[in-house]
């Protein structure tokens, strides 16, 4: 079994957790380390885009997990250090019990849908959570023209537009008033950030949709999973479609609703 360990950059507590995990893993497992962690523990390491493993243990927040999903190859197991950590499966208090489950193969592997993003026909990256087109200046709105399979839908004035996967529908899109999609639904959610007027609501498209968003007016920014950023100019066109390959995550929850209750709706009485 080949296991890679990735930690949030400049996170001392993450390094301490990594040491605990390293000591708990079977001695016959092959462990590789992402370079920033490797430097801290004085081990040989790999750049994140060089990592290819059976399991990738990621210690940090959702940003670290998305960075790993963007560049590394393997089944991702997230350990939450800090924030909400919706993409994580393990909290700090149950690390040892969860690693024991990992060793015993007491988990499932879920593949989350991804989105391929193109700007003017040139591939720009893959989104596991979302692709966001937003204004490049505070308090400035932009116009976005939306098409499905080259059929014009609407032109909307807003601070931005979010195109989310099912797992990404629990993130920025949800905060913007969008619906939550179950991970097995394979739909695409389009939500606007602070739209002008009451008509602009979230739209759910099928996985066969080729979305096109044309930038009307001034410059904007494209952000993919918060990891890749690209400047957009007037009349630039962003195409987004479902990727052939998403990202594989290790799950230790009984079902998605259990995770939803724990991470997003903690006030619900069970």
Swiss-Prot record:
Major location category of this protein: cytoplasm
Top-tier EC class: transferase
A Pfam family that the UniProt record links to this protein: NAD_kinase_C
Enzymatic reactions: NAD(+) + ATP = ADP + NADP(+) + H(+)
GO terms, molecular function: ATP binding; metal ion binding; NAD+ kinase activity
Biological processes, Gene Ontology terms: NAD metabolic process; NADP biosynthetic process
Cofactor(s) required, per the database record: a divalent metal cation
Swiss-Prot/TrEMBL keywords: ATP-binding, Cytoplasm, Kinase, NAD, NADP, Nucleotide-binding, Transferase
Record has Nucleus as a keyword: no
Entry's EC annotation: 2.7.1.23
NCBIfam families for this protein: PRK01185.1 (NF002255)
Annotated family: Belongs to the NAD kinase family.
Name of the protein in its database record: NAD kinase
Protein's organism: Picrophilus torridus (strain ATCC 700027 / DSM 9790 / JCM 10055 / NBRC 100828 / KAW 2/3)
Encoding gene, per UniProt annotation: nadK
């Amino acid at each position: 079994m080949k296991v890679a360990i990735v930690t949030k950059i400049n996170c001392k507590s993450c390094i301490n957790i990594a040491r605990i995990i390293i000591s708990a893993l079977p001695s016959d497992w092959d462990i590789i380390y992402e370079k920033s962690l490797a430097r801290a523990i004085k081990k040989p390491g790999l750049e994140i885009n060089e990592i290819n493993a059976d399991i990738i243990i990621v210690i940090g927040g959702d940003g670290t997990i998305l960075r790993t999903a963007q560049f590394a190859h393997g089944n991702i197991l997230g350990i939450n250090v800090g924030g909400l950590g919706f993409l994580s499966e393990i909290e700090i208090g149950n690390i040892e019990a969860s690693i024991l489950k990992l060793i015993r193969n007491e988990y499932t592997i879920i593949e989350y849908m991804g989105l391929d993003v193109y700007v003017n026909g040139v591939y720009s990256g893959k989104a596991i959570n979302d692709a966001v087109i937003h204004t490049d200046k505070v308090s400035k709105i932009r116009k976005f023209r939306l098409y499905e399979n080259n059929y014009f839908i609407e032109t909307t004035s807003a601070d931005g537009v979010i195109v989310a996967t099912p797992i990404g529908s629990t993130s920025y899109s949800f905060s913007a008033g969008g619906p939550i999609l179950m991970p097995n639904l394979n739909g695409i959610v389009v939500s606007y950030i602070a739209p002008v007027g009451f008509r602009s609501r979230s739209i759910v498209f099928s996985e066969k949709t080729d979305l096109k968003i044309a930038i009307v007016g001034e410059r904007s920014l494209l952000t993919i999973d918060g990891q890749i950023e690209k400047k957009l100019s007037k009349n630039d066109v962003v195409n987004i479609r479902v990727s052939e390959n998403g990202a594989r995550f290790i799950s230790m929850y009984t079902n998605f609703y259990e995770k939803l209750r724990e991470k997003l709706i903690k006030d619900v009485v069970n």
